[in-house]
Amino acid sequence: NGLTFGNFCDCLDLLQQSKQAAAEKDESTINEIFQDITLKLYRYKDPEKIPAVPSLLAIHAVNFFSAVWEMVLSGPVYIGGEAIDFRILFQKLASEDRKADDKTGWTGIVFEVAASGVFGNKKEVDDTPFWDVLLYLYKCKFEYLHQKRNKK
């Protein structure tokens, strides 16, 4: 799949916006958001001639994105035959280990990864494949948890 980390972050933001639009029963905004998500997930050969997105494709694109995200949040994902449990990224830390939350969410994470230089600057992080950045975040959290455990 060709999902970039930047498009992943955009899709998550759009999904949140769609929940708000659904609460307001704003069908035209929901349709527009679903179209935007679809265009972030699918690549057209000629970006100058992007066709109107069929509603059925938009619904399936959102369902697929949501299902993959749910898979990441709910259990191990097999990558290269290895079970990677991304849930460690979302576990709450004990209160003594918890840093103040700056409330920047995924945007803040992009800047943190860019600051590390592993994938380059923010634009380059945004253009990096989603799974590469997620694996890097997993590696960082895994190492942090094991360092913490070894200090005790």
Indicate where each model-derived feature is located.
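An amphipathic, hydrophobic-aromatic interaction surface with interspersed Lys/Arg
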Residues: N1-K152
